[in-house]
């Protein structure tokens, strides 16, 4: 029989995969997204890892994996500043950030912070790389 904590973790993992697949638009997790997920899980042992491929909302070819938003909840972030937390995420993803990933929005929180506000932020609409506002 599964323990309650394991069941919650399995349910959480399943919902993250569904969220990730639904947000990518194609229903398929690509190799870059899979690599990001694996590397963050290995480096930070997160309690929560929500990953959203936001490439479809930008001026890139269909199926691209260039723009991501991630929420990482880990006890490894305890006592660290936001900058130090982001550096840990960047270190884990150095290969992806040097290559295929153009933009990575990071929410790096402790378990207590996530408990207060357990949601992934939304990104603003893409302006196509220009700083002009849309009419």
Curated annotation (Swiss-Prot):
PANTHER family assigned: BOLA TRANSCRIPTION REGULATOR (PTHR46229), BOLA-LIKE PROTEIN 1 (PTHR46229:SF2)
Spans annotated as Disordered: 114-135
UniProt main location, coarse: mitochondrion
Keyword annotations from UniProtKB, A to Z: Mitochondrion, Phosphoprotein
Pfam families: BolA
SUBUNIT field: Interacts with GLRX5.
Function: Acts as a mitochondrial iron-sulfur (Fe-S) cluster assembly factor that facilitates (Fe-S) cluster insertion into a subset of mitochondrial proteins. Probably acts together with the monothiol glutaredoxin GLRX5. May protect cells against oxidative stress.
Listed name of the protein: BolA-like protein 1
Gene Ontology CC entries for this record: mitochondrion
Keyword presence, Mitochondrion: yes
Gene name of this polypeptide: BOLA1
Record-stated family: Belongs to the BolA/IbaG family.
Organism annotation: Bos taurus
Modified residues (Phosphoserine): 81
Places the protein is found: Mitochondrion
InterPro entries for this protein: BolA (IPR002634), BolA-like_sf (IPR036065), BolA/IbaG_stress_morph_reg (IPR050961)
């Amino acid at each position: 029989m599964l323990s309650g904590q394991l069941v919650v973790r399995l349910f959480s993992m399943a919902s993250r995969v569904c969220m990730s697949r639904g947000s990518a638009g194609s229903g398929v997790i690509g190799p870059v997204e899979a690599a990001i997920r694996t590397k963050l899980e290995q480096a930070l042992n997160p309690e929560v890892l929500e990953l959203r491929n936001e490439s479809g909302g930008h001026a890139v070819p269909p199926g691209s994996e260039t723009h991501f938003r991630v929420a990482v909840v880990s006890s490894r972030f305890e006592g660290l500043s936001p900058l130090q937390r982001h550096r840990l995420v960047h270190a884990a993803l150095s290969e992806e950030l040097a290559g295929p990933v153009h933009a990575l929005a990071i929410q790096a929180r402790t378990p207590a912070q996530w408990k207060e506000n357990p949601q992934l932020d939304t990104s603003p609409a893409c302006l196509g790389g220009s700083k002009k506002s849309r009419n």
